[in-house]
Amino acid sequence: MLESVKANFTESIQTMIASLEELPEPIALATQMMVNALINGNKILSCGNGGSAAHAQSFASQMLNRYERERPSLPAIALSTDTSTMTSIANDYSYDEVFSKQVRALGQTGDILLAISPNGASRSVISAMEAALSRDMTIVALTGLDGGEMAGLLGPNDVEIRVPSSRAVRIHEVHLLVIHNLCEGVDDCLFPETSQE
């Protein structure tokens, strides 16, 4: 048991170190894209399934409420929170459309879709990306493995933050850290703290 726990910590640390080597640039780019969108009066929609839905909701709540400092609310919507909408879409159409129909209704040109899937193959998230592209939105994709089908949908104005791991649990761990970096970066750019001297 103890060896298993230690092995999990070791693997997690190794994945974080590998991510440190590969992810700062796409994270910084995604942060700047979000800042620009918010300055221009746009919003950020976020989606994912399972643990990724929790990450999408965490991101939106930290935009709407706050991350670590007091500041005005920022416009963000997690598409996985309205169970009535999601279940009616899944029942009447298909689960694949639970996010895409919301993107078509809520998304506007200049908005950002934060699309989260550890393997880049979640059909409902891919459909949301396709809907976002049809609405002339920009996409920030949080993926892992080889990026899956999601990576193939991205254009030159989009950004992929791909965790260098093949294990979903490790990818989820890094995705949460990425989301915290995005939130902190947005706050730093829009609401810089002034030093008290």
From Swiss-Prot:
Location (main, coarse): cytoplasm
Binding site for Zn(2+): Q62, H172, H180
Gene Ontology cellular component annotations, sorted alphabetically: cytoplasm
Pfam families with a match to the protein in the record: SIS_2
CDD domains, alphabetized: SIS_GmhA
Protein name (record): Phosphoheptose isomerase
EC class name: isomerase
Binding site for substrate: N49, G50, G51, Q62, N91, D92, S122, H172
Cell location: Cytoplasm
